[in-house]
Amino acid sequence: MPRSLKKGPYVASHLLEKIEKQKNLKNKKVIQTWSRSSMITPVFVGHKIAVYNGREHIPIYITENMVGHKLGEFFSTRTYRGHNKKDKKGQKK
């Protein structure tokens, strides 16, 4: 079920505070966060945010197309190592 409209989007309060501090700076630093469930709002546009995927922080530049999505949607948390190759012994020629 989606979140109620009267509640508004979920954004971690510490993340909003960090963005407000950097809003007027010329040299914007990368903001690190562990909050993958925070929704991207128009305030985030133009900032670079490093989201934790379980192993490392991966930076992403926020654009207008990303507004309304969650931060965790843009990174996978699992590594794909490919399918196992079968032995040549059992294959037909």
UniProtKB/Swiss-Prot annotation:
SUPFAM superfamilies on file: Ribosomal protein S19
GO BP annotations, alphabetical order: ribosomal small subunit assembly; translation
Organism: Phytoplasma australiense
Name of the protein in its database record: Small ribosomal subunit protein uS19
Function: Protein S19 forms a complex with S13 that binds strongly to the 16S ribosomal RNA.
Keywords carried by this UniProt record: Ribonucleoprotein, Ribosomal protein, RNA-binding, rRNA-binding
Keyword Coiled coil: no
A GO CC term assigned to this protein in UniProt: small ribosomal subunit
Gene: rpsS
A Pfam family matched in the record: Ribosomal_S19
